[in-house]
Every structure is written in structure tokens, then in C-alpha cells.
Regions:
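Catalytic Walker B motif of ABC-type/P-loop ATPase nucleotide-binding domains
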Residues: 163-167
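ABC ATPase nucleotide-binding domains
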Residues: 237-276
Length: 276
């Protein structure tokens, strides 16, 4: 199947159901190199499920996910690991040190043994994310925010062409949220990586993403550049009247009050223990 997009990632007519319960339907979009896309929508709308379909953790019931023109279902797991960096919303803890946990991201690239090149890449990622002082600590001894940084560092050392991040700043304070997303945007811009992040905070998403994908009832309601998001779109999806202003060149969503003409949309339940 040929792609309708000149994209690193192309999602075409994707459908996913858990047992007989539809979660996603007719999802179409593409992400190009050097673009950061924010997937937005209410709780339970299917954002995490979509990321897991892209990463071949879940197999769609219909449609396809193409990575540079190839179906992800045709790729071996080792190849996916070198081409897609995935940061889950909740990272597992273990008795790895921070250094070893980040080094695990290099494993898909290692042929015989870990070399100096791999160690330098890990050192650079630890410095970029402010983790050097924690590198000998066990990851079950660090905070949730620090654990999110470790997960991002591990994804970055994979040197992927596509980054998938599920609520990458959910456990971070405001200062660290800004620092991490500034770094993420810089990596995408400077290295030509395609990035996708799911977000609940609209203002943070609009501040750092190039484009948005707004989901409602498991389908694409609207997509475009962040400056194209309108108050009517937000009201329809979230059931909340808002004004959107430009401050410092960035769109800012200002909630007004709940719109009784747009009640909060119903959720699509996502699989237990397989999605958040």
C-alpha cells in the first residue's frame, strides 16, 4: 500500500476494538520529519491506544500504520526498537541503576558488546536531562518525575526517527515540564525527528507542538497547525466554552464556563491493563 502522505509516519483508516467494544475508528493522519504532533482529547478517548497501535503493541482491527512506507506489523521487534522511541505514561521500576536503565535503550544497536560510542551517547543523554548526579542510583529509589526523565533519556539514546510520548510531563513540576518540552522540541527541530505526544494540558501542548490532532468519541474531530485550533472545536470536544488568545506569539486557551449546549462527551473505555 502506498502512502497518501510524504511522512515519516502515516496512519490510514485505522480501527481498533477491545473485544467487541470500538475504541478507535477511521483514524487518518501523517507526521513528517521535524514535526511535533500533540494528540488531544478527553480522558478515555483512545489517545494511549493510538500510540500503542503505532508502536505495534496493539494490532489494529482495520487500516494500517506505515513507518516510512512500511507497515509496522511487518517490522521485527528489534527494528521497531531502533526506529521508534516509546515513552509510556507509567514506567516500570526495577533494580537497574539510572545509568543501566538508560543504557538499555542502546541494546537494539549493539551487535557484539557495548562500546565507547554507546557509553558516550548515554552520558550525553544523562547530561541533557540533568540526570548525571543520579546515574548510580537505583530507579526504584528516585521520584516519579525523575523516572519520567529516565524513560525519555532511554528513548533518546535509541536514536529513533519517531518518538512517541504518552503524557511525558504528567509527574513533573512546572519548571521541569518546560525544560523537558523545550528539550523535546529542540531535538525534533534540530535532528529532524517526528514526534507525537499525548497531552491533557491544552496550553502546554499548543506552546510546544507544531500540530494538533483532536479526538472525539474515538475518531479524528479536527487536525491542523496549533494556531488553527478554535474555541468552537474545544467546546464541541470538551463541553467547555473557552476563549483562545495569542500571548507572546503562542495560543492560550482560557476556560469560561461549562457549556450546557455541549455536555461533556461520553468516554470510550479503553482496555484494562493494556491502556491507561
Amino acid at each position: 500500500m502506498t502512502s497518501r502522505y510524504n511522512s515519516v509516519l502515516t496512519v490510514q483508516d485505522l480501527h481498533f476494538s477491545y473485544n467487541s467494544h470500538p475504541v478507535l475508528s477511521a483514524i487518518d493522519f501523517g507526521v513528517e520529519a521535524g514535526e511535533l504532533l500533540a494528540i488531544l482529547g478527553p480522558n478515555g478517548v483512545g489517545k494511549t491506544t493510538l500510540l500503542k497501535c503505532i508502536n505495534a503493541i496493539f494490532k489494529p482491527k482495520g487500516g494500517c500504520v506505515l513507518l516510512e512506507g512500511r507497515s509496522v506489523l511487518e517490522l521485527r521487534s528489534a527494528e521497531i526498537a531502533t526506529r521508534i522511541g516509546y515513552v509510556a505514561q507509567k514506567s516500570e521500576t526495577s533494580r537497574f541503576t539510572v545509568f543501566d536503565a538508560v543504557l538499555m535503550g542502546r541494546m537494539p544497536h549493539v551487535r557484539w558488546k557495548i562500546g565507547n560510542h554507546d557509553l558516550k551517547i548515554v552520558d550525553a543523554a544523562l547530561r541533557r536531562l540533568g540526570l548525571t548526579h543520579l546515574q548510580l542510583r537505583y530507579i526504584d529509589q528516585i521520584s516519579g518525575g525523575e523516572l519520567q526523565k529516565v524513560a525519555l533519556a532511554r528513548a533518546l539514546v535509541q536514536e529513533p526517527g519517531l518518538l512517541l510520548l504518552d503524557e511525558p510531563t504528567s509527574s513533573l513540576d512546572l519548571r521541569n515540564q518546560i525544560a523537558i518540552l523545550t528539550l523535546l522540541r529542540r531535538v525534533v527541530d534540530e535532528h529532524g525527528i517526528a514526534g507525537i505526544m499525548t497531552m491533557h494540558d491544552l496550553n502546554t501542548a499548543l506552546r510546544f507542538a507544531h500540530k494538533f490532532l483532536l479526538l472525539k468519541d474515538g475518531a479524528v474531530f479536527a487536525t491542523g497547525r496549533v494556531e488553527e485550533l478554535t474555541g468552537d472545536m474545544v467546546a464541541e470536544v470538551y463541553g467547555l466554552r473557552v476563549d483562545i488568545h495569542s500571548i507572546g506569539g503562542y495560543p492560550i486557551v482560557v476556560p469560561m464556563d461549562c457549556d450546557t449546549n455541549h455536555p461533556h462527551p461520553g468516554h470510550t473505555a479503553e482496555p484494562h491493563d493494556h491502556t491507561p
